[in-house]
Amino acid sequence: MHTRILIGAALLATFALASCERATEPAGAPAAISAAFNHTTTADISGYYMPVEPVRIGQWSLDHLFLGQASEFETWEGGSRSETFGPVMLQFDDAASPMVATELGQAHSVTARVLPTRYDVTDTTVSFEGRSPELGRVAFDGRLDPDALATARRNLGDDGVVMTGTLTAGRQTVRDVRLRWWMGD
């Protein structure tokens, strides 16, 4: 009888301990996601970075590079994602598409927005990769000039170059892409 009680107590203790163990996620899953998306900024670099001169990739023209605010980066890096908006995005216009009237004036009627599959953003660099059905793999690597950006922000945007980089879409690469800053509407 005592043996049955001891065996029952041992089984009960084993089940109690087993229920306390936490389920583990596959090794590397969260680290892999967070490693693909990284921002380490100490200043507000948010805004629209627009080409100083036209940048063409086939029929597509770069409209802007967008950098969000710190909270938008944190939301994305925390796993909350949108299919239409990211903290770093590139937008292209189909230069062959008809022009239409918008609240900001005339714009091409067909655009392609490229959301990130990877980014690394600091106070002085922007490294971005994404994909779009229209352009395929898109990459941008740029150097940000903090002093020029500070001047542009004080002046609420101007024509001065604040970032210079290399843009690749599909199999075409454009070097020395020069961007100015605009805070947006």
Predicted feature locations:
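Helix-termini ("caps") and immediately adjacent flexible loops/tails
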Residues: 25-29
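Sec-dependent bacterial lipoprotein signal peptides
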Residues: 1-18
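Bacterial signal peptide processing site
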Residues: 20-23
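Central antiparallel beta-sheet cores of small beta-barrel/beta-sandwich binding domains
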Residues: 33-185
